[in-house]
Amino acid sequence: MAAKGAREKIRLVSTAETGHFYTTDKNKRNMPEKMEIKKFDPVVRKHVIYKEAKIK
């Protein structure tokens, strides 16, 4: 049997409080801290910071 992978699916939620989110994955071994990345929010039509949240 193969070992379980280190990548985990995460959700990037907009800090503009629009409810918009992106889904992606990250390697927990290389990046144990929470991810923050600047991406485009189509609701407000601006680039805003997206923060990591758990996928429910």
Curated annotation (Swiss-Prot):
Pfam families membership: Ribosomal_L33 (PF00471)
Any one cellular-component term (Gene Ontology): cytosolic large ribosomal subunit
Transmembrane feature ranges: none
GO molecular function, one term: structural constituent of ribosome
One Gene Ontology term from the biological process aspect of the record: translation
InterPro entries per record: Ribosomal_bL33, Ribosomal_bL33_CS, Ribosomal_bL33_sf, Ribosomal_zn-bd
Keywords, comma-separated and alphabetical: Ribonucleoprotein, Ribosomal protein
Keyword Ribosomal protein: yes
Family that this chain belongs to: Belongs to the bacterial ribosomal protein bL33 family.
Name of the molecule in the record: Large ribosomal subunit protein bL33
Gene: rpmG
